[in-house]
Amino acid sequence: MPLQAPSIGEKFPEIEVMTTHGKIKLPDHFRGKWFVLFSHPADFTPVCTTEFVAFAKRYEDFKKLNTELIGLSVDSTFSHIKWAEWIKEKLGVEIPFPIIADPTGEVAKKLGLLHAQSSTATVRAVFVVDDKGVVRAILYYPQEVGRNIDEILRLIESLQISDKYGRAIPANWPNNELIGDNLIVPPAATVQEAEERLKKFKCFDWWFCYEDKATAEEKELARKFLKRVANC
C-alpha cells in the first residue's frame, strides 16, 4: 500500500478531485461534517449498482448523522454521469451525492485503493472521516460482496456516541448479548480508580464496567440500523 495511504487516527490527505458535482477539495469541502468516501471497482457493474442504489436510499439517514457521501472509481466523469442517469431512468433512483472521476488512478493510489493485481480497478473500500478531517474507520470488501449500508450507518452513530460520552461501544450495540444498550466504561488507570469503579458502575469485574448513558433516541436510531442489517 502506498506510504500516503491514511490510517485510522490520521488526517485525511488534502487532495483536489474532479467529481460529478464539479471540483472538490478534500477534506475541506466537508468541513464541520463527517463524510464517507467509498470506492467501487467500476461503473455499469451489477454489485456496484446495487450499492449505489442502497447508498442513495439511505442518504437522508446519513444526513441525520451530519454525514455526507462521496463515491470514487477509476472511471471518467462522463461514465459516472451516464451511469447515474441509467440508474435514475431504469431503476427510478436518483444519485444525490458526488462521484470522484479518477481515470489516471492518481487519487486511488494516494488512498491505497488500487488492486494489487491491477492498476485499472479500484478496491471496494470505505473511509469514514469525522468533522475534524480525521480518518475514524476503514473498511475493505471483496469484489464479489456488496457493502451493508446500514452497518456503516450504525458504525458512524457508534463513533459519534463514543465521542460524545467518552465510552466504548460493545458488539451488536444497542442489542449486545451481555450488556444490552449500555456503554462500556474505559479501563481504570490506577488501583484506587479500579476499586472505586466497582461501587460507581455495574461491573463484571474491575476491568469490565458499563453504564446506561445514551439517550432513548440514540438507542432507537441504532436499533433501526441494526434491525435493517439483520433483515438484509
UniProtKB/Swiss-Prot annotation:
Top-rank lineage group of the source organism: Archaea
TM ranges: none
Catalytic site positions: C48 (cysteine sulfenic acid (-soh) intermediate)
GO biological process, one term: hydrogen peroxide catabolic process
Thioredoxin domain residues: 6-161
Locations listed in the record: Cytoplasm
Keywords: Antioxidant, Cytoplasm, Disulfide bond, Oxidoreductase, Peroxidase, Redox-active center
Residues annotated as binding substrate: R124
Disulfide bonds: C203-C209
E.C. number: 1.11.1.24
Listed GO MF terms: thioredoxin peroxidase activity
GO cellular component: cytosol
Catalyzed chemical reaction(s): a hydroperoxide + [thioredoxin]-dithiol = an alcohol + [thioredoxin]-disulfide + H2O
Top EC class for this record: oxidoreductase
Function: Thiol-specific peroxidase that catalyzes the reduction of hydrogen peroxide and organic hydroperoxides to water and alcohols, respectively. Plays a role in cell protection against oxidative stress by detoxifying peroxides.
Oligomeric and partner information: Homodecamer. Pentamer of dimers that assemble into a ring structure.
Remaining remarks: The active site is a conserved redox-active cysteine residue, the peroxidatic cysteine (C(P)), which makes the nucleophilic attack on the peroxide substrate. The peroxide oxidizes the C(P)-SH to cysteine sulfenic acid (C(P)-SOH), which then reacts with another cysteine residue, the resolving cysteine (C(R)), to form a disulfide bridge. The disulfide is subsequently reduced by an appropriate electron donor to complete the catalytic cycle.
Family membership noted in the UniProt record: Belongs to the peroxiredoxin family. Prx6 subfamily.
Protein name stated in the entry: Peroxiredoxin
Organism listed in the record: Hyperthermus butylicus (strain DSM 5456 / JCM 9403 / PLM1-5)
